[in-house]
């Protein structure tokens, strides 16, 4: 569950290291984002010579949350951290690599490019 002011790790090689959620997209009073949802983020920490700079505002897809993800078969999956992947206006990832596992719930939300770049899909 990601809300405004939540800090997330960046799970790609776009150059950003930490981002902060400044808006959850999808409805005027939408409060929480889960895996696969699109949020607006501000870049808080970036590496030198990366594709993005500190202070930029971008869109991102949430790929990991510390809050449980319930599956229809009754199983539960949770991660150690909150992480996101930066995307452009065409919903394509900015980076060329994804780090760490991603859940298969991203497939249902049509983020196929992220699924294909990920080293492991849980």
From Swiss-Prot:
Name the source organism. Answer: Brucella abortus (strain 2308)
CDD domains tied to this protein: Ribosomal_uL14
- Function according to Swiss-Prot or TrEMBL: Binds to 23S rRNA. Forms part of two intersubunit bridges in the 70S ribosome.
Q: Which family does it belong to?
A: Belongs to the universal ribosomal protein uL14 family.
Report what the protein is called: Large ribosomal subunit protein uL14
InterPro entries in UniProt: Ribosomal_uL14, Ribosomal_uL14_bac-type, Ribosomal_uL14_CS, Ribosomal_uL14_sf
**Keyword set for this entry?**
Ribonucleoprotein, Ribosomal protein, RNA-binding, rRNA-binding
Q: Which domain of life is it from?
A: Bacteria
A GO molecular-function annotation: large ribosomal subunit rRNA binding
Q: Which GO terms describe its cellular component?
A: cytosolic large ribosomal subunit
Under the heading PROSITE patterns, the entry gives: RIBOSOMAL_L14 (PS00049)
Question: Quaternary arrangement and interactors, per the entry?
Answer: Part of the 50S ribosomal subunit. Forms a cluster with proteins L3 and L19. In the 70S ribosome, L14 and L19 interact and together make contacts with the 16S rRNA in bridges B5 and B8.
What Pfam families does the record tag this protein with? Ribosomal_L14
PANTHER family, from UniProt? Answer: 50S/60S RIBOSOMAL PROTEIN L14/L23, LARGE RIBOSOMAL SUBUNIT PROTEIN UL14M
């Amino acid at each position: 569950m990601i809300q405004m002011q939540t800090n997330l790790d960046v799970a790609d090689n776009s150059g950003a290291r930490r981002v902060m959620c400044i808006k959850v997209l999808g409805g005027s009073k939408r409060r929480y984002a889960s895996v696969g949802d699109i949020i607006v983020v501000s870049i808080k920490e970036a590496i030198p010579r990366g594709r993005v700079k500190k202070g930029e505002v971008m869109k991102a897809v949430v790929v990991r949350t510390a809050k449980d993800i319930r599956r229809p078969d009754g199983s539960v999956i949770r991660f150690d951290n909150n992480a996101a992947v930066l995307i452009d206006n065409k919903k394509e990832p900015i980076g060329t690599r994804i780090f760490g596992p991603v859940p298969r719930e991203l497939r249902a939300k049509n983020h196929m490019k992220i699924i294909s770049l990920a080293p492991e899909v849980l």
